[in-house]
Swiss-Prot record:
<keyword id="KW-0112">Calmodulin-binding</keyword>
<feature type="region of interest" description="Disordered">
    <location>
        <begin position="1"/>
        <end position="26"/>
    </location>
</feature>
<dbReference type="InterPro" id="IPR046831">
    <property type="entry name" value="Calmodulin_bind_N"/>
</dbReference>
<feature type="short sequence motif" description="Nuclear localization signal">
    <location>
        <begin position="12"/>
        <end position="19"/>
    </location>
</feature>
<keyword id="KW-0539">Nucleus</keyword>
<keyword id="KW-0010">Activator</keyword>
<keyword id="KW-0804">Transcription</keyword>
<feature type="region of interest" description="Calmodulin-binding">
    <location>
        <begin position="8"/>
        <end position="85"/>
    </location>
</feature>
<keyword id="KW-0238">DNA-binding</keyword>
<dbReference type="Pfam" id="PF20451">
    <property type="entry name" value="Calmod_bind_M"/>
</dbReference>
<dbReference type="InterPro" id="IPR046829">
    <property type="entry name" value="Calmod_bind_C"/>
</dbReference>
<keyword id="KW-0805">Transcription regulation</keyword>
<dbReference type="GO" id="GO:0005516">
    <property type="term" value="F:calmodulin binding"/>
</dbReference>
<dbReference type="InterPro" id="IPR046830">
    <property type="entry name" value="Calmod_bind_M"/>
</dbReference>
<dbReference type="GO" id="GO:0005634">
    <property type="term" value="C:nucleus"/>
</dbReference>
<dbReference type="Pfam" id="PF20452">
    <property type="entry name" value="Calmod_bind_C"/>
</dbReference>
<comment type="function">
    <text>Transcription activator that binds DNA in a sequence-specific manner, likely 5'-GAAATTTTGG-3', to promote the expression of target genes.</text>
</comment>
Length: 647
């Protein structure tokens, strides 16, 4: 028994010892784990330290908002919130408004300006009437400019309370300068104020909405007892000034680099593709877009989506155009041409001295113009460049802009004071003056002299003694100037309408009506009828006796006699009377025989030639009237003598 008990005790001891041997030892942490845990604790402590100022500021702001809401309630003894709409004692509802939009984007350190550099105006209005408040103490209130959160009151037509406005005012970050510096106060004058220089010192990326607004409120203590609703601008982003070097321009300028346009990054793929094709500026981009838009789209490739393309084109079209113009003349008629602006876009059509905008053309005219535009793009080297300031000042004329009164005034002035007309014409046309664009009227190479003098009304002498009809003068020129017509046939072939003289006819004392349109029959096309004068009837002419009397008065004037003496001395080579023609006067050789390749660009000399021929024609007509009058007087005297002999 004793042995068995000992055995059991020994077995139990072995089992107990064995259990102790089988139990695993406690796992010791690795050295790396200890390091990681230590770093985590340290990082957490640093995070808490960095979050503490932020948490303190948030708590402080929330407490300020809560106290601001509780303050008015305690003063008024009401626990409800303030009403949304508050009117003054006189029933007016006063509101501040920004009348100018900001120039975006804004950068830190940059001046806050209106669109295109304009100043920013604010106004105080009465919302009930929509009119500005120009009287009363509120019209000269002092205002404070503050920065608001971008998500404050996105609805433009929604009112807000003063507490709501104050709760969204943004303060500067801890340790930073004031968020908005400069002239943060403005005083109204008759209800209108102008913002001074304002500068942001910090970007808007650190607030929840990542955008700012400018707010405007009445300074505390001003206009007490009167509610004036605050003003706010649209939400905008303020970027760091380091990105200003790469900012886009709104609107872009013609000479801006092409990467200033939306969707084209500097030194990006699109930028490199455009520069490889010689498209370096915004003006180059617009010109290619107007002339061949599919080509430009192909250059940019499939990497630019349709949405990006639309945004790019829309931004480019906001570019401000210059006054430069380009004109392409039709091959068959040198007084008809199409006008392009500086980006090669069709602006209108010129015919004679008239300008027609592209919007005013009829369907048939548009078909003709489209053909000219296509030819102009194919032969751009033939397009002539002009300064478009004179064209921009034009008033678009009616269908008939050259009146008979203008032609009469010119003819009268040319006969009464020919030297003044020629001297004035020469001095008023500089050597580089274009024959197409004058100070007032725009005409082509077929422009008549009367039309050109129409652009210089100060040169025309309106003499009431000589308001005879131009049709009579033209008839006389056609009847008695056949020799001049033969001499100037070369210039007539060059489409100089001022020299379109009819064939030589017999010298008769009668005057017959001539249809003015027949004179220009060789040069007519379907566009030139816009500027042709109407026909004149026989009843519109002066009588022969009245014409004779008035021409006699003109020729007997002192100015005309001095003019004739001058030409008598200068003509014929030596001024001898033996060299005078039958009319008693000679003319100096001002007109040289034109060569076969007459240069159409010699606008000034061409106009001078036309001027001298007009004067010579008018004078020859006067000489003919005097000669015929003398012959008639001689015939009357002879008949009287015969009657006396018969008696």
């Amino acid at each position: 028994m004793m042995d068995s008990g000992n055995n059991n005790m020994n077995r139990a001891k072995r089992n107990l010892d064995g259990n102790d041997d089988d139990q695993p030892e406690r796992k010791r942490p690795a050295f790396a784990s200890v390091i990681v845990e230590a770093l985590k604790v340290d990082s957490l402590q640093k995070l808490c330290s960095s979050l503490e100022p932020i948490l303190r500021r948030v708590v402080s702001e929330e407490l300020e908002r809560a106290l601001a809401k509780l303050g008015p309630a305690r003063l008024t003894g009401s626990s409800g919130s303030s009403p949304k709409r508050i009117e003054g004692p006189d029933g007016r509802k006063l509101q501040l408004h920004f009348k100018s939009r900001l120039s975006l984007p804004l950068f830190t350190g940059g001046k806050v300006e209106g669109e295109q550099g304009a100043v920013i105006h604010v106004v105080l209005i009465d919302a009930n009437t929509g009119r500005a408040v120009v009287y009363g103490p509120e019209a000269s209130a002092k205002l404070h400019i503050v920065v608001l959160e971008g998500d404050f009151n996105t609805e433009d037509d929604e009112d807000w309370t003063q507490e709501e406005f104050e709760s969204h005012v943004v303060k500067e970050r801890s340790g930073k300068r004031p968020l908005l510096t400069g002239e943060v106060y403005v005083t109204l004058k008759e209800g209108v104020g102008t913002l001074g220089e304002l500068v942001f010192t910090d970007n808007s990326s650190w607030i929840r909405s990542r955008k700012f607004r400018l707010g405007l409120r009445v300074v505390s203590g001003c206009c007490d007892g009167m509610r004036i609703r605050e003003a706010k601008t649209e939400a905008f982003v303020v970027k760091d000034h380091r990105g200003e070097l790469y900012k886009k321009h709104y609107p872009p300028a013609l000479n801006d680099d092409v990467w200033r346009l939306d969707k084209i990054g500097k030194d990006g793929a699109f930028h490199k593709k455009l520069t490889a094709e010689g498209i370096n500026t915004v003006e180059d981009f617009l010109r290619v877009m107007v002339k061949d838009s599919p080509k430009l789209r192909t250059i940019l490739g499939s990497g630019m989506s349709n949405k990006m393309w639309d945004a790019l084109v829309e931004h480019a079209k906001t570019c401000v155009q210059s006054s430069k113009l380009y004109i392409y003349y039709a091959e068959d008629s040198r007084n008809v041409g199409v006008v392009f602006n500086n980006i090669y876009e069709l602006s209108g059509l010129i015919s004679g001295d008239q300008y027609f905008s592209a919007d005013s053309l009829t369907d048939s005219q548009k078909v003709y113009v489209e053909g000219l535009v296509k030819k102009a793009y194919e032969n751009w080297n033939l397009v002539i460049e002009y300064d478009g300031k004179s064209l921009l000042d034009l008033k678009q004329p009616q269908r008939l802009s050259i009146t008979h009164t203008n032609l009469e005034n010119y003819s009268t002035a040319a006969i009464d004071h020919p030297m003044q007309m020629v001297a004035g014409h020469s001095s008023s046309m500089p050597p580089n003056q274009s024959p197409v664009l004058s100070d007032f009227a725009i005409g082509g190479y077929d422009q008549t002299l009367a039309t050109r003098y129409h652009s210089h009304p100060q040169l025309l002498n309106s003499n009431p003694r000589a308001q005879f009809e131009v049709a009579s003068c033209s008839t006389s020129q056609d009847q008695f100037m056949g020799n001049l017509h033969q001499t100037q046939s070369t210039i007539n072939n060059q489409h100089m309408n001022g020299l379109a003289l009819g064939p030589s006819q017999s010298s008769t004392s009668g005057y017959q009506n001539i249809n003015p349109s027949s004179v220009h029959q060789a040069d007519l096309n379907h566009l030139e009828d816009w500027s042709n004068p109407r026909e004149r009837g026989p009843d519109d002419f002066f009588s022969e006796e009245e014409i004779r009397l008035r021409s006699h008065e003109m020729l007997e004037s002192e100015d005309m006699q001095q003019f004739l003496r001058l030409f008598s001395m200068g003509g014929g080579g030596n001024g001898s009377a033996t060299h005078l023609p039958e009319d008693g006067y000679t003319f100096p050789s001002f007109l040289h025989t034109p060569m076969q390749g007459y240069d159409e660009d010699r606008g000034r000399s061409g106009r001078a030639v036309v001027g001298w021929l007009k004067i010579k024609a008018a004078m020859r007509w006067g000489f003919f009237i005097r000669r015929k009058a003398a012959e008639r007087r001689a015939q009357i005297v002879e008949l009287d003598d015969d009657d006396e002999d018969g008696e």
